[in-house]
Amino acid sequence: MEIRVFRQEDFEEVITLWERCDLLRPWNDPEMDIERKMNHDVSLFLVAEVNGEVVGTVMGGYDGHRGSAYYLGVHPEFRGRGIANALLNRLEKKLIARGCPKIQINVPEDNDMVLGMYERLGYEHADVLSLGKRLIEDEEY
C-alpha cells in the first residue's frame, strides 16, 4: 500500500470510492469539494493506493488553530487491513509538522463501528455540539 497526495487523475476514482463508502450527501457536491480542496492545500488530501487502485482517502485541513479530517473512507473489500489507521496517522504527522496542536473529526452519533475505531486511535468524545451554516449552496448531487 502506498499513501500519497491526491492527484487530478484520481478525481473520478475517488468519487466512485466515496459512493461505495456511503460518504456522499445530497447537499455536498463531491466534485466541488475536490475542486475546492485542490485550490486550498491539496497536500492534506491523501489517498491510499493498492496495486494502482485508490482504496482509501482522507481530506485534511488546518486553520492555524485546529486540524480536521473529512472523507475518511476505505473501499469495503479492503477494510480491516489498517488502511484507515494509516491514512489518519499520515495526516496527523503532516499536521504535527505544521505545529497543529489538535485535530477534530465529526462522526454521526449512530456510527458505532467508526466511533470504535477512532476511540482505539486515541480520539475522545468532546462535550461540544457541532453547528454548521452553509455559506455557498452546492447543487444537489
Curated annotation (Swiss-Prot):
Pfam families: Acetyltransf_1. This is Acetyltransferase YpeA. Residues 1-141 form the N-acetyltransferase domain. PANTHER family: AMINOALKYLPHOSPHONATE N-ACETYLTRANSFERASE-RELATED-RELATED (PTHR43877). GO terms for molecular function: acyltransferase activity, transferring groups other than amino-acyl groups. Its EC number is 2.3.1.-. SUPFAM superfamilies: Acyl-CoA N-acyltransferases (Nat). CDD domains: NAT_SF. InterPro entries: Acetyltransferase_YpeA, Acyl_CoA_acyltransferase, Bact_Acetyltransf, GNAT_dom. Belongs to the acetyltransferase family. YpeA subfamily. The gene is ypeA. It comes from the Bacteria. It comes from Shigella flexneri. Keywords: Acyltransferase, Transferase.
